């Protein structure tokens, strides 16, 4: 771990955290833009449903696989240097995507964006742990998460309006400029104080960090947790961030702005959901029953959305999913209750990595299902959503069947 830093004033700490939160806002925007970008990209670049799914998944794949590297960087180099070195890749990826003329270039842009955004939330949590009192960690982290959700508001109606009046290239261009402004703000505003004199310094090697993560799999309940983490968050972001827009446009002939309005409503419904579940859910290991129950409820909701082809019903189901989406944060409470303090940090890192690699897996597999569906006389969106529902049930079953913490 990095040595403890000298204390910051409350005003200075909040000012720096707000600047860092802007990178997190943009990471949320980039991970959810496929729902609105999907239809124009499909039309202009002749993308198949499978290619669209793979493109959206590329962000989450890059984001997920870079979590260990970013965690090590934070320990060795600190918050400021980690985000300043990584985030230019987001700017470059967005700029490259705005000029893409082929699927391959679009994929490279998406991989760069995902890599650059990888430390966006980690730097916030590490900064909070270093510069806020321990009792403030959860409420301040929750505030940052709520701020971050505004990124998905940007990629709802505002992005749809911009694309409808210009093109999808302008969407990437505006996000690239926003990322550049954010980088400059962080460069100007975020300056962590030097470590206190005499503070011990321990810097883990990459191999030691990987060994520590792999050691968690010797605990029998880790497998169930990872199986669940791979599918829970993935279902929400795959619908909100990938299939919602194309489904509404193709099934019901919604305009891009109309589908953006639905995405906006779904996002607004989800903003207060984590805080709600944090208040009503039981503490400790009782969370396990809640996690399994909510996964089953959401899987049934997704299956209903797949089979009921009525516009108002699909819109209502999407908003209901937003209201229920906060159940996923209960995984963090489960980790806190199940793992000893000595390995809790690594367990949380593993959970985060599994969540984002799961999004990549979910989007790729649902894209494959959508691509194969017409050959069997099945609507692509029906196949994609039923596949997602089945994967969520499988993850919940593994979580129930394997030993608990």
State the predicted function of each range.
Residues 66-78, 273-286:
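Helix-to-loop junctions at the C-terminal end of transmembrane segments
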